[in-house]
Structures are given as structure tokens and as C-alpha cells.
Amino acid sequence: VAEAVNLGGVKVMVIDDSNTIRRSAEIFLVQAGCQVVLAEDGFDALAKIADHHPDIVFCDIMMPRLDGYQTCALIKKNPRFGVTPVIMLSSKDGLFDRARGRMVGSDEYLTKPFTKDSLLKAVATHLPQRVS
């Protein structure tokens, strides 16, 4: 049984071209108290990130137009979001993909399909410690 993680008020952006992945991530995160911002691809995410200021970003690698590596690099190059944790999502679990993710500044790599536990653990691990 998963312990109840309280992530109340944490703002999470999920960038994935798969509606199924976006929806399942949203359900898991909302159940834990997060505010969720969804984006269909890198361009959509870059248009929304400045308005929403997420605390953490989950970014799919394989997306049309702007892939996850390019999206992560652009987020990290922006001085306002340079310290925002970016976690790559991929159905591939290769060493090369992980290394490439690190090169563009990602903080972690989560393999799809992810579980509720692995998603929430990633959020809790990478959030700045909040004083309660």
C-alpha cells in the first residue's frame, strides 16, 4: 500500500504528446494535492511555463516538432527556470537516453509506463524542502 504523499499546492507541468499519459499523470498528481498544468508538446509547454511557473516539470522525450531534449534544454537555459527540476519521461530505458537527458540538464529519468508511486516519489525527491 502506497503511503499517502501530501504534495498540496505543488505545481507540476506534464509535457507529453500522449493524451493517455497526460491524463494518468494528472490523476495521480491531483490525488496527491498537486496543481497540474498539461502541455501536448514542447512549444505548448514553452508557451505555458512562464504563466504557470511550475515547481517541477515532467517531459516526454519522443514528441513531434520539439523533442524532450530540446524542450528541457530551452527550459534550463531560461534564467527563471534554470533551477526548476525537469524529469524526462520515456518508454525507452537506454543508457544513451539517460546520458543525453543529463547533458541537456534533466534531473531524473522515469520510464513509462510509470506507477503512481514512482511519479510521486520523483516529485517529492526533487522538490525544494518545504518548511511546514
How should these model regions be labeled?
Residues 63:
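Receiver (REC) domain active-site loop signature in two-component systems and cognate sites
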Residues 114-123:
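C-terminal output helix
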Residues 33-40, 48:
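Short hydrophobic/Thr-rich beta-strand motif most characteristic of the beta2 strand and flanking loop
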